[in-house]
Amino acid sequence: MAPKKNKAAKKSKADINEMTIMVEDSPSNKINGLNTLLEGGNGFSCISTEVTDPVYAPNLLEGLGHMRQDSFLCDLTVATKSKSFDVHKVVMASCSEYIQNMLRKDPSLKKIELSDLSPVGLATVITYAYSGKLTLSLYTIGSTISAALLLQIHTLVKMCSDFLMRETSVENCMYVVNIADTYNLKETKEAAQKFMRENFIEFSEMEQFLKLTYEQINEFLTDDSLQLPSELTAFQIAVKWLDFDEKRLKYAPDLLSNIRFGTITPQDLVSHVQNVPRMMQDAECHRLLVDAMNYHLLPFQQNILQSRRTKVRGGLRVLLTVGGRPALTEKSLSKDILYRDEDNVWNKLTEMPAKSFNQCVAVLDGFLYVAGGEDQNDARNQAKHAVSNFSRYDPRFNTWIHLANMIQKRTHFSLNTFNGLLFAVGGRNSDGCQASVECYVPSSNQWQMKAPMEVPRCCHASSVIDGKILVSGGYINNAYSRAVCSYDPSTDSWQDKNSLSSPRGWHCSVTVGDRAYVLGGSQLGGRGERVDVLPVECYNPHSGQWSYVAPLLTGVSTAGAATLNNKIYLLGGWNEIEKKYKKCIQVYNPDLNEWTEDDELPEATVGISCCVVTIPTRKTRESRASSVSSAPVSI
């Protein structure tokens, strides 16, 4: 009898389920096993990283474009008067605020009528919506801008604006201005007009120039930033436009009133302006010529005759240095006047009529005035060589005229302008320290003595604040002083003010806004030696109090100071610690209460004077330098 087979033990459902679960969990267990490598001490760290498919977005747009061409799943029609386009709502609404707003109001909308748009403009917009690309042309850009503005696709408007600015040329600049004006593209219009101002001579030779309206050419000739080699060129361009059409002659007086005849040399007025028939036959035009000739014939009256027609066009406000004693040629004084251009490069502007040291300078009505100082280098007896010289430089024509000398010789004094007058205060000469004050009246070319200070003072500094001349520190009774006094030109009287915290002499003083600043200079130390004064003091005329601001980075005396763009510039000077001339330029920002080092002077210099004047553009100066009739002259 065959042996019985052992029956396999019957497995319960729980056992079966457990087996099933074990089989199903195997891959998961493998993953968990791998994860333990990350968590274990011998594992490695892992961070998640976002990855991007660079061709996904372009492929998506390309696919949507093919779907639109096949009219597949298109759910909206946009139509002009003559042509319709099938599009996808989601695509158009994603880039057009106009369409998005309409669909928000009515998501079931099937058609949008855009009867004011051209088919070309709408087709270009649709191409842009589906590709982000488009072909622009000056011939069709108007229709594209019109469509982009209506549909409120701001990125497309920006692309069109950038295209117009990039494509602007002498040939098409007027067209670009008109396009920008039509569609109120302010940035584009300003850029095109700026291009025209900078290339006005080249534009004036184009046919489009002669098609300018009176309003357009008048706007250009009124513009202070119009770049031309000379104002004579502006006159010739205006005459060219007037002569093109006899109907324009009625505009001659008004148009030519924009020409700054006072900045045209007398020689050119006679040779090139007077011989234009209109300037002699038309009474109003003739008056413009006569006024300009009188302006040149009366140099001492020019201050009160200043007007828009005597101001250089497109002038540059620059920092000037005047005279001084350079370190490399310590025994000889300098005649040079330097200016710093837009690139912070120092250039020679002109020369003074004579070498000078410790002179004072001031700017009034656009003219540079240079007064006093010393004409010889004699450190042991500077006062002996004080001079009373006084001259005026005209940066428009690069000319000097010698004016009436000061009544007294002065060095180590101060010079300020107020209400159209110049005031020379204190100083010293061979007679010793001076308390006297004299005032120059430009219209009469005369100096007048004014009320003197209570005590003689030299080596001080002064600035105009709150309608008064504030005189600070200096040398009084053979000692450095803290004393401050104020001169009121309206009453010709002096008044003592609160003293400085630190005595100082050979320092500088300037005004920025409603505050006066006293900076630099030297005083006596504990052992009787001269030391630099680093603290800078600020005067508040409303409270009459002095306060400290950020100190100088480098101590200097007999330096030059000026203000430009609401910043104080302190240039050169003598440093007591190093016992050497300095070429550093220190700049103070009152808003930040901070001093910084700027580019240096070309040469270390002491006894230098500084100011800010407006000079003609380089193009204008070069044009005059090449013209015999405009060569520098001295009266």
From Swiss-Prot:
Domain named BACK: residues: 173-274
PANTHER family, sorted: KELCH-LIKE PROTEIN 31 (PTHR45632:SF29), LD33804P (PTHR45632)
InterPro entries given in the database record: BACK (IPR011705), BTB/POZ_dom (IPR000210), BTB_POZ_KLHL31 (IPR030604), Kelch-typ_b-propeller (IPR015915), Kelch_1 (IPR006652), SKP1/BTB/POZ_sf (IPR011333)
GO CC annotation terms, alphabetical: cytoplasm; nucleus
Tissue: Strongly expressed in fast skeletal muscle, and weakly in heart. Not expressed in other tissues.
Pfam families named among the record's database cross-references: BACK (PF07707), BTB (PF00651), Kelch_1 (PF01344), Kelch_KLHDC2_KLHL20_DRC7 (PF24681)
PROSITE patterns the UniProt entry points to: BTB
Tree of life domain: Eukaryota
Entry protein name: Kelch-like protein 31
Organism annotation: Danio rerio
Kelch repeat intervals: 318-366, 367-420, 421-467, 469-514, 516-566, 567-615
Gene name of this polypeptide: klhl31
Residue span, BTB domain: 74-138
Keywords for this protein: Kelch repeat, Repeat
